[in-house]
C-alpha cells in the first residue's frame, strides 16, 4: 500500500445505486467430466403465446457451476415431462441420468405466475416405477419417496432470475444434503484506467449478473468485506489521499468513515457477530492487528511484533484471529487467541503462506501458498494438517469462501490481466470470471442472504 501513487483528483461517490447487466461471464475450465449427470427439463408453459422467461437456463448453469453436476443438453433428452407422473424412468436411466428437475409455469394474475417444480431421484423411481407404497395409519398409501422435493410459489414477472437461483438452492440441497449458495452475492473492485473514475466498488449476484456499483473513485479502493447480515461492506479507500476504512450499506449506499489513523488502515473484517472489525493499523509503528468496536469505537491492540502482521480473519467462534506474519522470517500463517494473546504458527509447507481464511465449519483453512515461486490457492486442515493445492493458475490472491463451504472465489492473472476465478473446495472444478472491460480483484463472497 505504501507504493500506491496518489493522484490529485476529487472523489466521485455514487450515492445513488447504479445497476447494470453483469460484466462477468463464468468460463468453465475444468471439472465437468467428473460431475454427476442430471437433467434440468425446460419448464412447461401453460399460458398463451411464449413463456415470459426461461428458468431452466439459469438453474442448469447454477448446478453445473457448483462442480458437482453435469446437466445433459436439452437436445439429448428422451422426453420433456413436467411432473413426476409423466417420467419414463427407464429412458432416463439408460442415459445414466441420476436425477431430474421438472416443473411448470402458468399465469396467476397480472404479471404474476405460479411456478411448480419437483426434484426426482431417477434410480429410485426406476425401481418403484414411481408407485412405491408405505403404511400410514394402517393403510397403504403412495410414498413418493422418489420425489426428493416438491414446491410451488407465486412470483412477480421480475423475479424469475432470483427464483431460478432459489430452485437451484433447493435442488442442490435435495441432491447433496448441503445448503446451496446460489442466492448469494459477491463484492469486488474493478479497475479501468481509461475511465475518469478508474476504481469501482461493486456488488453482483454470485454469477456476475445484476451488478450494482456502490462507489466510483479516482483513487484506489480495496479489501471489501461483508457484514454477517449481508447488509453492509467494510472497505479501504484512498479518496482523501491516505488509507481510511469505511462501512457502507449496500442498499441505501449510506456510508460511515470508521478509521483514519496515520499510516496504514487496512484489511477490515467483520467479527462473526457483526459487532467488531479486525483490521491492520500502523499508527503505533509497524503494521499490527487491532479489533475495533463498531458501536463504541473502542480499539484493542492484538499483536505486538517487530515485523509485519497483516491479513486478519476470524475463526468461526469469534475467539481467535488467523493472520499473516513475517515474524519467522518469511510470510506464514498464525493464529492469536483474543483473550490470552497466545500466538501459534499454523503453516510450514512451501516458501510462503498468506491470506488464510477458514471455511464455515472451521475444519479447513483456505490460503495462498507459494512454492517454487508460484502462488496457488491451497487448503489445509485446521489448525494443522495436510495441505492440498487446489489451483493451477499463478499469482493467485485474496481467496474468499462461499457460505456453504463448497467453493472458493479468488483473484488471479489471465492474459496479463487480473480476473476472478472459482475453484471447488476439492479442487476438481475450476472456472474464470473475466471482466468484459478493465480488471477485477479483491473478491468477497457474501453470507447467505
From Swiss-Prot:
Record's keyword terms, sorted: Cell cycle, Cell division, Periplasm, Signal
Record bears the keyword Cell cycle: yes
Family matches, as SUPFAM superfamilies: TolB, N-terminal domain, Tricorn protease N-terminal domain
Gene3D superfamilies reported for this sequence: TolB, C-terminal domain, TolB, N-terminal domain
Gene Ontology BP terms: cell division; protein import
Chief site of localization: periplasm
Domain of life: Bacteria
Extent of the signal sequence: 1-21
Gene Ontology CC terms, in alphabetical order: periplasmic space
InterPro entries, sorted: 6-blade_b-propeller_TolB-like, PD40, Tol-Pal_TolB, TolB_N
Locations listed in the record: Periplasm
Quaternary structure and partners: The Tol-Pal system is composed of five core proteins: the inner membrane proteins TolA, TolQ and TolR, the periplasmic protein TolB and the outer membrane protein Pal. They form a network linking the inner and outer membranes and the peptidoglycan layer.
Similarity field: Belongs to the TolB family.
Function field: Part of the Tol-Pal system, which plays a role in outer membrane invagination during cell division and is important for maintaining outer membrane integrity.
Protein name per UniProt: Tol-Pal system protein TolB
